[in-house]
From Swiss-Prot:
Gene Ontology CC terms, in alphabetical order: endosome; Golgi apparatus; membrane; trans-Golgi network
Any GO BP annotation: recognition of pollen
Protein name: PAN domain-containing protein At5g03700
Lineage of the species this protein comes from: Eukaryota, Viridiplantae, Streptophyta, Embryophyta, Tracheophyta
Gene3D superfamilies the UniProt entry points to: 2.90.10.30
Length: 482
């Protein structure tokens, strides 16, 4: 009897232990509240009731969160966010996303892994760590023991650089729309615009002044880092910067977080979080017309006047309907017109290649003979000829009539669409008219058949004109009455 009671008590303890273990694991996996670390065995799926961001992990100060970010309503990306910042500080590969559904699963097994069979997405840190943590500076890390970092998000920036984060020559900041990027050169920071699938255009450059330290050949590439004292520093070796790009908060004691973002208009802006709001702290490009494409394709940006179209005839924002892809102007199927205009200059000309010609005609001829050339801009004073070998974007409007532009404008998608639309519309009207005609003929034919059948049933008696009263059938009726 005592053995039976002991066995029953043992079974109860075992069941209680199993329940506690599995209930603890279930709470950890499906907890709504974010935790301070994720350990091996963690799993999570997106919650269908959440419409923006589902936090899974937070830093110890509660300023940053890591979790599922809902993108375009039905898509999902892994992201690190700040509660008072509209856009995330870090996003896992913005060119790829998973579906926001129960099929998507995130887990940590030493590697951070996300799988979505429906989108054929499978990503992993390929590590063998013990924990996933979020540092107080927003750095997401896979760590082994307490000190060894096997993977960190700071090595894979998106469009944001955070205070004290190293930005190396192997990295790039990319704007959310994918059109602009920031990279390091041998002794400078450069901003680039994607002007076609094959090429990029340099549009902003900040070279190191090398006042306190010099760039040394063979000493390795430079790196950039936001200093808490309010500047973006460039370094090569040691802690002495080869350049200091000052923010508004430069050498002012502030208690907050500094970030630098490459935004969708191509500008590089710095922000300061002071504990209550984000304040603009830096702008690389101060003038609107110095941005890479402020007015759109085939347009002019004139300082103090705003945007206009190169041909002076179309509505702003619709200066052309032409495709923004490269073209072969030597192909006979490529239709285009030529627009000439004075008071035009290429933007960021200091960063563009040029050739010297003796006349405008010679400059134009160089573009005419080049099958890939979209336009040429000529300075009659210096003789500089700038060839634009990509779809025309925003040009710079100037008051100097000696600066002349020659542009090839393709017969655009809009015109072709209008022709197609007109053809479709006319065809539709013709079909409707044909259907109505057939319907009218059919109805007329049915009425004629009906009347003919009635006449045959009545032996030819039918209401008709007065002159028919003299017919043979009518006379026979009268004779019978007599």
């Amino acid at each position: 009897m005592e053995g039976l009671c002991l066995n029953s008590f043992t079974r109860v303890l075992l069941l209680l232990f199993v329940f506690l273990v599995f209930s603890h694991k279930w709470q950890r996996v499906n907890a709504v509240e974010p935790v301070l670390e994720l350990v091996k065995g963690f799993e999570a799926k997106p919650d269908s009731s959440i419409d923006s961001f589902q936090p899974l992990l937070t830093d110890s100060n509660g300023n940053f969160s890591f979790g599922f970010l809902r993108v375009n309503g039905s898509r999902l990306s892994l992201a690190v966010t700040h509660p008072n910042l509209t856009d995330p500080l870090w996003v896992l590969d913005p060119t790829r996303s998973a579906s926001w559904s129960h099929k998507t699963k995130l887990f940590f097994n030493g590697s951070l892994v996300i799988i979505d069979p429906s989108s054929r997405l499978e990503w992993s840190t390929h590590t063998n760590g013990d924990r996933l943590i979020l540092r107080n500076d927003s750095n997401l890390q896979v760590v082994k023991t307490s000190t060894f970092v096997e993977w960190e998000s700071f090595d894979f920036p998106g469009n944001t650089l955070v205070e004290s984060q190293n930005f190396t020559s192997a990295m790039a900041l990319v704007s959310p729309n994918g059109l602009y990027s920031m990279r390091l050169g041998s002794d400078f920071i450069g901003l680039y615009a994607k002007v076609s699938e094959e090429s990029q255009q340099f549009y902003w450059k900040h070279s190191a002044l090398q006042a306190k330290a010099k760039v040394k050949d063979g000493a390795g590439p430079i790196l950039a880092r936001i200093n808490p004292n309010g500047y973006l520093g460039m370094y090569q070796t040691g802690s002495i910067p080869i350049d200091v790009e000052a923010f508004n908060s430069f050498q002012r004691p502030v208690n907050g977080l500094l970030i630098l973002r490459l935004e969708s208009d191509g500008n590089l802006r710095g922000y300061l979080w002071d504990g209550s709001h984000w304040a603009l702290n830096y702008e690389a490009i101060r003038e609107t017309c110095d941005l890479p494409n402020p007015c759109g394709p085939y347009s002019l940006c004139t300082p103090g006047s705003g945007c206009s179209c190169i041909d002076n005839r179309t509505v702003i924002g619709e200066c052309t309907h032409a495709a923004s892809s490269p073209a072969d102007f030597c192909d006979k199927t490529t239709e285009f017109k030529v627009v000439r205009r004075d008071g035009v200059e290429v933007p960021f000309k200091e960063l563009m290649d040029h050739k010297t010609t003796s006349s405008l005609g010679e400059c134009e001829e160089m573009c005419v003979d080049n099958c890939k050339c979209f336009g040429a801009v000529y300075n009659n004073g210096s003789g500089f000829c700038y060839l634009v070998n990509y779809p025309i974007r925003t040009m710079l409007g100037v008051a100097d009539p000696s600066k002349l532009g020659y542009f090839k404008v393709r017969e655009g998608v809009g015109k072709k669409k209008s022709r197609v639309g007109l053809t479709v519309g006319m065809s539709l009207l013709a079909v409707i008219a044909l259907v109505l005609m057939v319907a009218m003929v059919y109805v007329g034919f049915r009425n004629w058949r009906r009347e003919k059948r009635v006449l045959e049933e009545d032996n030819g008696l039918s209401p008709g004109p007065y002159k028919n009263l003299g017919s043979d059938s009518f006379n026979s009726v009268e004779m019978s009455r007599r």
